């Protein structure tokens, strides 16, 4: 979570909404607190407003009956029936995979098989080799609906034509509810940091770590850039696991995570973060969450697979100041995310191309910004790599593409005793609630291992603070987007 400054105030340039709220209710409860005493959450009645060239538009709310009526008006009664079938399947997937995947410290194949056997309605989405886009083409006739629901693959950094059909469950995860955070998503990070300090955690923000010290076959300390050494019995690394494999925190850590846990890489992004006056016919209808679809998905994801910038990408626009409902007066804060290939170096023509392919298209669709953002408002894949060395600019960690991708993602325990993983690059994956769950899994692993070694008797049922515990990381003003 991060912000960048603007004349209208700090712009959230990372995640834009909160989903799976129960994860955070549970997290605050673990510390004996209530989330609502620390943050004001703004429920979004419309999950997203979807736009296509030619003027067609579809709002989705998460209410199956209401959404089916909207789909009927948008694409006809047959597609409304198809939507109901898809929604039922996605609901079944979400319920079946929650306990054996999301809530488990690692995906358990036996438990997954058992859960799936009891839900034959979800079997069509589990066929090996069937992509999410392929599955949706069997569900819907209207290509716009295929395009809309296939896009959920990008929420975890995958291409719809290569990501597995099981990712249809992301629709139901979002449909369970979307909240904006008053003041911006970074307020969640601030609230958690404040709570951690109250519990005795020593936060050292913007403190670079030079290496994780390995001695006698286990982690013994973390060495900071200024030479300070922090002895530890356990170290939780919340960066991209690819940094370990690249040796950025010490040669002795290269084999802590298998190569299959960090490659292939997920998508990156070009991200605009700025303040401006929105004008044009579409301006009154912009909401917090907006998606402007490309005319041809193949023209978007084909170039991405080749490491190129699409000529007509889909554009995600977060109008941050519209989360509470009324249209603000004066400049507003906006974040626009354009999918990008990982590992792409900055090229001289990239700014002009990305600017034209973003703002010329929006002008054609009836939306303009005054002033239009300059180069300093754009975060590129190469910038993300510099911010997160070893990541190749991927903002979702390992790619979710492939039938068994979820089993390849690294879990909390690494091959090096004393070293643990948390964050979007670890199980269960990318996204704010998933990263939070990864922290829960890492904490449980640390406590279990320390207890087994006779170093602690701490229980996970009540808040505890470990003397000398240290968290290092970046300030929230860094530039690193994630949806």
For each of these PLM feature ranges, what is it?
Residues 1-96, 398:
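N-terminal glycine-rich phosphate/pyrophosphate-binding loop and immediately adjacent elements
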Residues 15, 424-447:
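A conserved FAD-binding loop/helix module that cradles the flavin
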Residues 40-42, 202-206, 374:
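General small-molecule cofactor/ligand-binding pocket signal
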Residues 53-162:
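Rossmann-like flavin
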Residues 142-156, 312-316, 368-428:
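A glycine-rich dinucleotide-binding beta-alpha-beta segment and adjacent secondary-structure elements
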Residues 168-223:
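Helical element adjacent to the flavin cofactor pocket in flavoenzyme catalytic cores
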Residues 210-328, 462-463, 467, 478, ...:
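Mid-domain catalytic core of redox enzymes
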Residues 314-399:
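FAD-dependent oxidoreductase catalytic-site/capping-region signature
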């Amino acid at each position: 979570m991060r912000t960048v400054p603007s004349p209208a105030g700090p712009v959230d340039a990372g995640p834009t909404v909160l989903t799976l709220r129960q994860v955070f209710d549970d997290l605050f409860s673990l510390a004996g607190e209530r989330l609502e005493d620390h943050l004001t959450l703004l429920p979004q009645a419309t999950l997203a407003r979807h736009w296509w060239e030619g003027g067609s538009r579809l709002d989705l709310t998460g209410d199956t009956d209401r959404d089916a009526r909207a789909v009927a008006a948008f694409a006809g009664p047959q597609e409304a029936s198809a939507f109901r079938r898809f929604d039922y399947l996605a609901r079944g997937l979400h319920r079946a995979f929650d306990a054996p995947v999301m809530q488990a410290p690692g995906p358990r194949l036996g438990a997954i098989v058992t859960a799936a056997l009891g839900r034959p309605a979800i079997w069509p989405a589990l066929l090996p080799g069937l992509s999410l886009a392929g599955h949706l083409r069997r569900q819907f006739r209207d290509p716009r609906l295929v395009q809309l629901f296939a896009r959920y693959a990008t929420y975890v950094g995958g291409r719809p034509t290569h990501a597995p059909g099981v990712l249809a469950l992301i629709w139901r995860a979002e449909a369970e509810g979307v909240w904006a955070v008053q003041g911006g998503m970074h307020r969640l990070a601030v609230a958690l940091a404040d709570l951690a300090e109250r519990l005795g955690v020593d936060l050292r923000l913007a403190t670079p770590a030079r290496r994780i010290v390995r001695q006698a076959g286990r982690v013994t300390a973390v060495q900071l850039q200024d030479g300070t050494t922090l002895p530890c019995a356990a170290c939780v690394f919340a960066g991209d696991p690819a940094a370990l494999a690249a040796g950025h925190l010490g040669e002795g850590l290269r084999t802590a995570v298998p190569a299959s846990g960090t490659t292939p890489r997920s998508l990156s992004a070009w991200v605009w973060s700025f303040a401006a006056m929105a004008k044009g016919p579409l301006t009154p209808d912009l909401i917090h969450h907006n998606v402007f679809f490309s005319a041809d998905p193949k023209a978007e994801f084909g170039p991405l697979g080749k490491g190129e910038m699409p000529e007509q990408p889909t554009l995600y626009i977060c109008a941050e100041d519209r989360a509470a409902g009324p249209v603000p007066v004066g400049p507003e804060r906006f974040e626009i995310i354009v999918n990008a290939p990982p590992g792409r170096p900055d090229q001289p023509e990239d700014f002009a191309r990305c600017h034209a392919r973003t703002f010329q298209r929006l002008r054609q669709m009836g939306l303009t910004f005054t002033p239009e953002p300059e180069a300093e408002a754009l975060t590129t894949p190469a910038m993300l790599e510099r911010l997160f060395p070893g990541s190749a600019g991927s903002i979702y960690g390992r790619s979710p593409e492939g039938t068994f991708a979820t089993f390849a993602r690294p879990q909390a325990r690494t091959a090096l005793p004393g070293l643990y993983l948390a964050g979007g690059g670890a199980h269960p994956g990318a996204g704010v609630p998933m990263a939070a769950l990864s922290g829960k899994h890492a904490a449980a692993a640390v406590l279990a291992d320390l207890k087994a070694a006779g170093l602690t008797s701490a229980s996970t049922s009540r808040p505890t603070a470990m003397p000398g515990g240290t968290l290092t990381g970046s300030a929230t003003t860094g530039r690193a987007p994630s949806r």
